[in-house]
Amino acid sequence: MTSQTGKRGFTLIELLAVIGIIIIIAGFVLTVIPGLQEKSQSKGTEALLGQLEIAIDQYYNDNRSYPATGTETTGIEYLKKALAPSDPTAKRYIEFNRDELKGNNILDEWGNYLVYRNPGTQTSTTGSYDLYSAGPNGTSTTFGNDADDINNWSQ
């Protein structure tokens, strides 16, 4: 006769309880992560707009005018060329990361083009230009005033 008292293990109920806890934790993590990612992208775009505002102010101090702009769709290209010219002898006001650019366009954290207008049409904290991202949904119905838009006049 052999005795079974020396064997140890988990009961079926203990295993099911652990699996249940793991499923609950996984469900919580999967619902929280997308919100954290969007918040991180919003903060990254706000930081980029802040860096651009500093560079624009430095440009203004040197030239006594804000960078020129074309149409709403080309304004950001003019801004990029003014702040980070391709001419190596010209003064650069900002350095961009590769993922912040697509050609001469400056991108937000969602890969959408930023918008720059001079003169600005909003009551801007900077006074003379509008700078904004269309935000997570990628659309701006009222010139940068959508609820999720990130701009320089309401920060």
What are these regions (language model features)?
Residues 12-16, 49-52, 83:
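Generic leucine side-chain signal with a strong bias for well-ordered alpha-helical environments
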Residues 3, 38, 42-43, 50-61, ...:
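Short, surface-exposed interaction loops/tails
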